Amino acid sequence: MARSTTATAQTGGLSLETVEDLFRRLEQLNEIGAALSQEKDTGHLLEKILVAAKAITRADGGTLYVLESSDEGPRLRFAIMRTDSLGIAMGGTTGSDIPYYPIHLSGKDGKPNNQMVAAYAALTDKTVNIADAYSEEGFDFSGTRNFDKKTGYRSKAFLTVPMKNHMSEIIGVLQLINSKDPATGEFGPFSHSDQRLAESLASQAAIALTNRQLIDQLERLFKSFIALINTAIDEKSHYTSGHCKRVPELTMMLAEAVNETSDGPLRNFNMSDKDRYELEIAGLLHDCGKVTTPVHVVDKATKLQTIFDRINLLDTRFEVLKRDLEIAALEQKIDLVSQPSLEKVDARDRLGQIEQKLRESLRRLESDREFLRHCNVGREFMPPETQERVKQIGTGYQWTDISGGTADFLTQDEIKNLTISKGTLTHEERETINHHIVATIKMLEALPWPKHLENVPEYAGGHHERMDGKGYPKHLTREQMSVQARVMGIADIFEALTAKDRPYKRGKTLTESLNILGHMKLDGHVDPDLFDIFVRKKVYLRYAEQFLDPDQIDEIDESKIPGFAADPA
């Protein structure tokens, strides 16, 4: 079986190339190489490779195959197809899918698929230059002939070039069809110069494609490491398991809305794809410092919770008090009935008094017990009189422990926790929680960020700052913060307000959340211009439709939102 692995016709059907033409095409090749190295999108890069190869060899048509793995073994996937004279353009930026099955490099019997010219080039790492497919006996061109029969085309000359990466591994195949004579417009074979130019281009293209694939793989690996960190954080706390995913989503929604703004103070804010990627990475890493936060603080669902809920200790103490009261009452009754001189009527009255006092004491105990259980649940606000009652209960009862010693019913630490005015965290615990942003900044600033990601620490580290400088940890003002950091601040707050997985509160409705956020604008907490865009562009609604429960999405009267400026300033 004949194998055409070099040019079978170097000049047949084509005029001899002039030296000037060859130099022109070499210059074109150099320009193409430079252009390919600058392309950032893999799909666009594949398209540029084929279009450039067609131009430099004057091919009417061509296909670019990409080698990929499958359950049946390696195969060549149709990535880009072009045939100028038929107006065919599929794959790439066309949005038109290529309706052809991939070419497997081996058959079902495991033998090499040397019948298909593209597979043969990939398997042998050899260029195949065929002058006339209709007279070629070495390969199976039945599919090509069927295509020609349907379209009236004649696929005559084929130039098939393997593409190798820096490790000499085949990554794809470039196939060109029908070289067009610039003088006559007729189709003919590819010359030896065409082949050398195509091979040179394929080599440059393979390097550019490999670089792009390596960059894409590294970016995917980098994101996977970030996802790994976020998974660890989510596993620590099922109460905030979605926070690390939702904040980046809302951050990008608001950033895009600002990017689309053509008037107002933020009209000059523009994001490139690089800027978007940088902000996305910052959003994904904004809480990475939470890996250092103790889980019993992160998950503190009640005020008395440490590694367990200490309310059960209080229940035990109440049972001890109840037992002591009942024992004391029984002892009084026994002492009473043991007095022989006591008249029956008087004894009955005194026994009734003992029983009545016991019932009243037990009712008071049960009332105080339920009261403390109620206080143990974190709420929006605990009034001073409620806090005072906790303190009275704490020191008003004395209980006897197993060693026989007596102590106040509540320890000072328990009183401190039960009188937390808002939520479930003490000041010290809140400082521990807040320390996660310090840890985040330290962790991110320790990394050797490339130039296109150098702002990640600033973006991620500023979402707890306030516009008036009263935030933490650096007490930055609005003027000291980037727009991106301020965007993330709003996203972080709104997500927390609407989150339905917090242990001490329900997820708020849109109206409630926007009212709180509006007051935060007036109070100098969040950026006023970003807040107005957040409402005006209905970013809150897009987020709600994706992440909130239906009962949280109520009707919004934007005119009643505190501080909202309906029209751009």
Describe each model-derived feature in a short phrase:
Residues 12, 123-127, 173-174, 196-218, ...:
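Signal-transmission/dimerization alpha-helices at domain junctions
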